[in-house]
């Protein structure tokens, strides 16, 4: 997938990519209780959409650059690309949303390491 990851996708490919990302993220939250699952479901869809859109914006930025040249009368000026602005805004929102999702992940209970102490006490 790394080869075509940076190519533009058509609408159907985008929908499939979003669905795949939703499935991937949903798998991480499979053990959630039903109340949290309802909250997480919508957030997962939004995060999946943002991730795919960020990839699309990245394709545009890699091909067109972060700056564009605009004619201003007799001279030209360099201004920030609209894709650059959109990417910067969306990456902040994506980071916030993914952080919220990570907070909702079930906490893994650290397994107790058997150090043999219980066996020692039981044997006395």
For each predicted feature, which ranges?
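Extended, surface-exposed interaction regions
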Residues: 1-83, 120-124
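Low-complexity, intrinsically disordered regions enriched in charged/polar residues
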Residues: 12-19, 23, 91, 95, ...
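Helix-rich interaction surfaces within compact, conserved domain-sized segments
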Residues: 77-109
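Protruding loop/beta-arch "assembly-hinge" segments enriched in small, turn-prone residues
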Residues: 108-124
């Amino acid at each position: 997938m790394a080869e075509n990851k940076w190519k533009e996708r058509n609408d159907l490919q985008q929908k499939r990519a979003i669905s795949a990302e939703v499935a991937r993220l949903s798998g991480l939250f499979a053990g959630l209780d039903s109340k949290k699952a309802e909250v997480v479901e919508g957030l997962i869809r939004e995060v999946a959409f943002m991730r795919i859109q960020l990839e699309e914006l990245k394709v545009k930025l890699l091909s067109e650059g972060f700056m564009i040249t605009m004619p201003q009368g007799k001279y030209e000026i360099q201004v920030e690309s609209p894709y650059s602005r959109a990417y910067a805004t969306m990456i902040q929102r994506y980071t916030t949303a993914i952080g919220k999702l990570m907070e909702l992940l079930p906490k893994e209970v650290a397994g107790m390491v058997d150090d043999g102490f219980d066996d020692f006490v039981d044997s006395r």
